[in-house]
Amino acid sequence: MKLLVVDDSSTMRRIIKNTLTRLGHDDVLEAEHGVEAWDLLTKNEDVKVLITDWNMPEMNGLELVKKVRAEKKYEDMPIIMVTTEGGKAEVITALKAGVNNYIVKPFTPQVLKEKLEDVLGTGSGEGAAE
């Protein structure tokens, strides 16, 4: 299964990608911002999950989520937002935009695992509200 990780921090992309690899997900694409992510998404029809930061240049994560959700072929794609924006208002805004799950940085690999399992329907359901 191909996943797309979007973050303007190369360090954060590496952390997320390494965690996903340890979880058995070897096919991970990376983008630095929403414009690059959109380009990769439209050129890689087999991307199944989008993991995106919120605050990025050119097109932020919230704008990316709205653009993805506006396309019928992506309406069911699981989206996880990984961000420092941890306020209740931000979480609600992201969920209303179409994010399926939300992780506040910093986070542990276990949290990413649980959130990914939750959006894929493969986990026990624990950790869905973190």
Swiss-Prot record:
Segments forming domain Response regulatory: 2-120
Main localization (coarse): cytoplasm
Ribonucleoprotein recorded as keyword: no
Single GO molecular function: metal ion binding
Localization per Swiss-Prot or TrEMBL: Cytoplasm
Free-text remark on how the cofactor is bound: Binds 1 Mg(2+) ion per subunit.
Highest rank taxon of the organism: Bacteria
GO biological process, one term: archaeal or bacterial-type flagellum-dependent cell motility
Names of required cofactors: Mg(2+)
UniProt entry tagged with the keyword Magnesium: yes
Pfam families (alphabetical): Response_reg
Post-translational modification 4-aspartylphosphate, affected residues: D53
Binding residues for Mg(2+): D7, D8, D53, N55
Position of the signal peptide: none
Keywords, ordered alphabetically: Chemotaxis, Cytoplasm, Flagellar rotation, Magnesium, Metal-binding, Phosphoprotein, Two-component regulatory system
One Gene Ontology term, aspect cellular component: cytoplasm
Function: Involved in the transmission of sensory signals from the chemoreceptors to the flagellar motors. CheY seems to regulate the clockwise (CW) rotation.
Protein name as catalogued: Chemotaxis protein CheY homolog
Biological source species: Campylobacter jejuni subsp. jejuni serotype O:2 (strain ATCC 700819 / NCTC 11168)
